[in-house]
Amino acid sequence: MASKRLETLCKSLTREVGRISSQTGRDDYDARRKVADIARELINETTHPSDVAAQYTINMAEMACLRMFQKWKLLDKIPASGSISYEDLSASINADKNLIARMGQMLVATGKLRQTSPSHVAHTRLSTAFAHRSPPAVWFSMSFDETLVPWTQWPRYFAKYGPRQPSGQTAVPMTFAEGADGELTCYEVIARGGPERMADFADGMQGIPELMPAAGIYDFAWVGEAVAEGEVDSDMPLIVDVGGNLGQALLEIIAHTESSIPPDRCVLQDRADVIAAADALDNPVLKKVRKMPVDYHQGQPLKGALIYYVRRCLHGFTDEVSIKLLKHLTAALPADPRARVLICEQITTTPPDPYTTMMDICMMNVGSKERSEDDFTNLVTAAGMKVIKFHRGEGVATHVIECARA
């Protein structure tokens, strides 16, 4: 029986590999994911149960070494072509050469770096993704620091609080792991870590564009068309990005609509410190966007916008806090029947998707969760709105939930 299963998987793998070379863009990502999923099934079928624990330990050691190579910017110092010695790497940060060599050997052993001689290493196709603050690099470092550390404290956390879902803002695994249990919120813990930690968190929360696209799921083209036809008042804000960080999503949306949505009629809202950071960026499009520091938990000061856009915010909040935030947006909607609240989030499915389920376990550290379609429908209804449609991106678990006043 096992042999028959392996034969089937091998045939499927060969078929899907043949499709990769003919795909581009989003289709290429889907094809690669199918190949990886089948390969993972093959590994599961051929791995002896007694080998799993050892493999997990190898993975943990690899991640620890990779994080330190990132932290010390050693990956940035490895040339794009050619190699570098452990001696030169260690000298660049005044480190113990043997320490750097031992960590590097772990990355060589798992295929993340390539050994060109016993004392030299070079990049591989995969390691370059973790250098120079690329989106995957920032995502990994943020995930390691802000989620893996609390996960390691789960046994102690649940021993104290019992086998119940974490809730609230201060008595959660993340604050527990930081020694701030019952004293600080998660954001206060991150802020306490200083500007570098805050920047890593802000950048990391934007995620990896391939997995969490801001554009291409919901069609914003109608907004630009309405402007061109003079169908909206000239003083009406078009898109208000609530909790929009440094404007990454707005920039993606504007670019995707070929700039038919005027940037000066878009608004970026976030905490004052984040808005100050966005103001300092040298981006000609972002400079035209109106920036507004707000506490969106206390209310929505800008009324009457055509679209209020909330991306990757609600999954960090409890149902109670999310409903309160959405009620503020409901109250801000104009009478225009086209006015919308758009919620961009991952949505849980049955059977579970690995990526979304991972995000749900991450959110457990801060006392929140990822949600199903029914969960979002309940939130939206409680906030005085109705769901018009769930828009799903091809090959990703990210949705845009289109909402209007009930």
UniProtKB/Swiss-Prot annotation:
<dbReference type="InterPro" id="IPR036390">
    <property type="entry name" value="WH_DNA-bd_sf"/>
</dbReference>
<comment type="similarity">
    <text>Belongs to the class I-like SAM-binding methyltransferase superfamily. Cation-independent O-methyltransferase family.</text>
</comment>
<keyword id="KW-0808">Transferase</keyword>
<feature type="active site" description="Proton acceptor">
    <location>
        <position position="315"/>
    </location>
</feature>
<keyword id="KW-0949">S-adenosyl-L-methionine</keyword>
<feature type="binding site">
    <location>
        <position position="270"/>
    </location>
    <ligand>
        <name>S-adenosyl-L-methionine</name>
    </ligand>
</feature>
<dbReference type="Pfam" id="PF00891">
    <property type="entry name" value="Methyltransf_2"/>
</dbReference>
<dbReference type="InterPro" id="IPR036388">
    <property type="entry name" value="WH-like_DNA-bd_sf"/>
</dbReference>
<dbReference type="GO" id="GO:0009813">
    <property type="term" value="P:flavonoid biosynthetic process"/>
</dbReference>
<protein>
    <recommendedName>
        <fullName>Methyltransferase cfoD</fullName>
        <ecNumber>2.1.1.-</ecNumber>
    </recommendedName>
</protein>
<keyword id="KW-0489">Methyltransferase</keyword>
<dbReference type="InterPro" id="IPR016461">
    <property type="entry name" value="COMT-like"/>
</dbReference>
<keyword id="KW-0284">Flavonoid biosynthesis</keyword>
<comment type="pathway">
    <text>Secondary metabolite biosynthesis; flavonoid biosynthesis.</text>
</comment>
<comment type="function">
    <text>Methyltransferase; part of the gene cluster that mediates the biosynthesis of chlorflavonin, a fungal flavonoid with acetolactate synthase inhibitory activity. Within the pathway, cfoD is responsible for the methylation at position C3-OH of flavonoid. The pathway begins with the PKS-NRPS hybrid synthetase cfoA that uses benzoic acid or p-hydroxybenzoic acid as a starter unit with four rounds of chain elongation using malonyl-CoA to form the chalcone skeleton.</text>
</comment>
<dbReference type="GO" id="GO:0032259">
    <property type="term" value="P:methylation"/>
</dbReference>
<dbReference type="GO" id="GO:0044550">
    <property type="term" value="P:secondary metabolite biosynthetic process"/>
</dbReference>
<dbReference type="InterPro" id="IPR029063">
    <property type="entry name" value="SAM-dependent_MTases_sf"/>
</dbReference>
<feature type="binding site">
    <location>
        <position position="312"/>
    </location>
    <ligand>
        <name>S-adenosyl-L-methionine</name>
    </ligand>
</feature>
<dbReference type="InterPro" id="IPR001077">
    <property type="entry name" value="O_MeTrfase_dom"/>
</dbReference>
<dbReference type="GO" id="GO:0008171">
    <property type="term" value="F:O-methyltransferase activity"/>
</dbReference>
